[in-house]
Every structure is written in C-alpha cells, then in structure tokens.
C-alpha cells in the first residue's frame, strides 16, 4: 500500500479488522483470525489482470478468507450498509458441484482483490 493510514482506516473501519503490531513501514491486522501484513510501497502503476472463474472476471492479484455462512452473511450486510462497491456481487458459485460456495469480491483502496467465501460443505474446501 502506498498509504498506511488509509489502509489502517479501511481495514479497521470497513472490514472490522483489529490492529496488531505496526511500524512506520508496515501494519499487522487480525484478518478474520489470520495475520494480514500491509507494507508501505511506492504507488503501484501495474495493470491488474483478470482470469475467468465460473463465468466471472476475477482479479489475478487477490487473496481470500473462508468464513462460516453466518460470518459471510454478516460481512455482506456490513459492507452493503457502508455502500462498499463489490467487484463481484455476493453469489453462489459451482452450484450443485463439489466446491459449491457463497462468494464475493471487493478491492481495498490499492486495488488488491479480497475474496470472501463460505463453502456449502467444508469437506469440499480443497477437493478437486
């Protein structure tokens, strides 16, 4: 990120993450029970590429987290209340197949894609 204060505000205020350790060069967040580290870097001028997944254009530069269905629905409601733009609207992907999941994508202020998903069956998380 090219602005750590903007990152801190966005991840805490929009997503509800809590702060961990921080310096003038990086910030740790509690990202839904996982450590997310945002580092200070010069403004990125790279084009963000996409690939098709189940008919949707997905940012090739993204990361994600698996939530329970209840957590996923609460986060969808929180983001809708904050009028956050979804890059991929909340939906069900791979319906009726192994890996069926509720998913949506958003971007942070630096165009990093974030995917949030909840699987219909947790045994399918890494099935092929």
Residue ranges and their predicted role:
Residues 1-43:
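Core segments of cupin and vicinal oxygen chelate
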Residues 1-2, 30, 50-128:
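Vicinal oxygen chelate
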Residues 19, 27-28, 52-55, 95-96:
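Short secondary-structure boundary/capping segments
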Residues 25-27, 34, 59-61, 82-84:
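A generic structural signal for short beta-strands and their flanking turns/coil linkers
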Residues 37-38, 44-48, 121-125:
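A short local loop/turn or secondary-structure capping micro-motif enriched for an aromatic residue
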